[in-house]
Amino acid sequence: MRAEHSQQPEFGQRVRRRREELGFSQRRLAGDIVTASYISLLESGQRSPTLDLVLHLSEVLQMPLEELTGRDRSSAAATEPGGLDLVIARSAARGAAELGDHARAAELLAAAYTTAVERGAAALQLDLGLALQEELRAAGRQPDRLALLERLADQEWATTDPRLRVVLFTELATAQRDTGRLTDARKSAYTALGEIGPAELTGAFEHVRLLGILISVLCELNDLGQVELLLKEMLSHAEGHRPPVRGRAHWVSSIAYSQLGMGTAARHHLDLARAQLTTPDTPVRDWLRFMRSAGNVLLDDGDPGAALPWLQAAEQVGPMVDAPDETTRILALRARYELAVGAAAQVVEVYPRLSAGSAPLTGPDLVRANLVQAEALAELGRTEEAQALLRRTAALCDELTAYELAVRVWKRIDTLRS
């Protein structure tokens, strides 16, 4: 097999020199991001670093990004203390996030990011901006996260490096998906996918993750024509990765196959995902999301008995995570379960907390909750209310540009009329 040679051999040389200065082993430098063997290949110029790895190395090697990447114009510029306060703020924010205080972490990072913008420090803007968008996501501030990522993706320096474009447009796609802008999310995901080759990331973690995001967006849009092919591509690339990556690929596959009506395949991938993700390394919030997904997949397959333990586990774990949006989604799963076991009155009782509570559902989540509520109303003989809700839901689908889903909603309205 031909070795993959880096187009930036000087980067590996800088990494090796600094590592040896600090007396670090390649294993210590690798951390949990890559393997020691990968660091060896990187230092010898046979691998190119991803953006996440560059940021990791900058932190571990205690080198400014400009110096590490060779973009500084002088040694004085590389050691200028002007960004020290921002590095300290970044560290403080990391500490707050580790304690679960994502609101405080976002506050610290937002102030540091604003300062970096005022100073015109492009590398720090990128570093702090990407860190900030993660904390905004964890804090449930999706509109703020979207606005930030749109600013980052619109910067002139965001057009020059394909690896950077992969990162930015991947995150932008998730933010657009999470705020219901599904057509925009699909466009951003395809934009990022077009940069995978130039960025030399084919088959890398970033590629696997991006395919999963694209698949999820297409499923939300009910645009399923290419989903099976994309699933096969994603699973093929994921095979050579560590359990967390494989687990998430199977997780996405379980949801997608369920959407395709292939219940057996969905449950198979659900089992594979569970086997890969049942480790102490899986963040609690991710495990909570997985439990919700498992419950929904099993309800899709008409098995409320199998879904119930996952629902109950999610209800127990939910209070451990400071995430009001997740709490509402768990409640939506409860409503769906109650409908499946014939407790329509319970669904109607729960619904106001889904649509107008402290963290109401939006976008595709609200569409799904509305469909459950409409079915419950119909079962209770409140047909006119069900039809009115479905009409509002069809209009929401149009706003989300989920036109195929809107057609399905109108067909259900027609059956209620007959």
Give names to the regions the model predicted:
Residues 50-67:
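DNA major-groove recognition helix of helix-turn-helix/homeodomain DNA-binding modules
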Residues 81-85, 120-127, 160-171, 200-213, ...:
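Alpha-solenoid helical repeat architecture
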Residues 20-41:
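Short alpha-helical DNA-recognition segment
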Residues 73, 110-117, 150-157, 190-200, ...:
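Amphipathic alpha-helical segments of tetratricopeptide repeats
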Residues 1-21:
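A short, Lys/Arg-rich alpha-helix, primarily the initiator
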